[in-house]
From Swiss-Prot:
GO biological process: one example: proteolysis
Start-end of Acidic residues biased regions: 43-54
Lineage: Eukaryota, Fungi, Dikarya, Ascomycota, Pezizomycotina
Protein name: Methionine aminopeptidase 2-1
Top-rank taxon, per record: Eukaryota
Protein residues bound to a divalent metal cation 1: 231, 242, 440
Subcellular location: Cytoplasm
Amino acid sequence: MGSKSPEDHRQGPDGGSADAAVTIINPPKSAAASGLLQGMLEGQDEDGDDDDDEKTGINVKTYDGAKKKRKRNKKKSKKVAVIQQTFPPRIPLATLFDNQPYPEGQIVDHVVKDDNIKRTTTEELRHVAALNDMDDDFLKDYRKAAEVHRQVRHHAQTIAKPGVSMTRLAEEIDEGVRALTGHTGLETGDALKAGLAFPTGLCLNHVGAHWTPNAGAKEVILKHDDVLKVDFGVHVNGRIVDSAFTVAANPVYDNLLAAVKAATNTGLGEAGIDARIDHISEAIQEVMESYEVELNGKTIPVKAVRNITGHNILRYRIHGDKQVPFVKTKTDQRMEEGDIFAIETFGSTGKAHLRDDVGVYGYGRNENMSPAVLHQSSAKSLLKTIDANFGTLVFARRQLERLPGVEKYHLGMRTLVNSGLVESYAPLVDITGSYIAQFEHTVLLRPNCKEIISRGDDY
């Protein structure tokens, strides 16, 4: 989920060297290979025999009085009990893995930097806080969220074909996340335990980010010549995995998708402890803008979008205070041990500068505003519902409307937005007729390595 640059938009909850070598220690596993099939053999050795069978016999006298051993028949092997994910995926991961560890992401060695600078006191405090969050459940929660994302997006990729409606696609993703995390989000506070980290983004063509279908709007159907960006997040106990991909049925857009995917992988390769963000941004832009696209007989350069960025992720907060632009920039910020980053890139055939469009993508609580300014009872009640069910997570109208007892909330929401207690987020668009692609992964900067937690066989 992209973060708008601070000079263009007030930040809300939604809102290294180029030739460094990257060593892959542990390649990614596909969802199918990392938990879709699981079985157990109970009380069996490899050959299916019990040990006692080989040691025990029955003494039988022969006609000449000699003793002869009669071997017992070997027990037949029991059949393997197989648990297989359904299509669409609806079996919770807790059932599928049965207390087995969730798959790792892609493990990559840190690149040693020789241009380190002394951290300030503020940076040290932030560093300590990040490491303290890495408790015993940290990797378990993150790997579970990542595996949910892989399985749900695999299903989404199979149905994201021309003719599918955006409403159906969004519902399939939303319901898949809820089913696999085991949290429907209907009971008060349940969505804060695990589920959607932000509204599922389904952006077509010149719409770059922050669009999702809502009830009452005109239905949008995917067409053969569309470029669709699918951006959704999964959280487990507030540990957020943010990952996105682009699909296009028409091969004319292949170079656009290849440019953005290569740029994202470049950013992931450059990311690491003490990596300079300005170096990462420059490397991303260089790769992205080395590509061209042939559209309607014209050769069009792929441009890196200038005013939306990658970002670090905090617990229950999709956007932290660090940003990773896709264009060359001046900043002294560095990545630090314990940081979690959403490394994403957007490439456009248009102006590569996004602006707010009409409509509302989602809402997010502004923690810096006190509810003491509220006097309207309906607004107070709605704010209480938001705090209890979403906290600092960004949510869409359809997520709010499915909660029991929520109805006729529009006046209260308008009051909350006008008072600054809740922020609303509009779709972000380039010029009409342009095409934008996006790819994104979440990377954990662990003390001894970086783990691209959302990596899969697909991208």
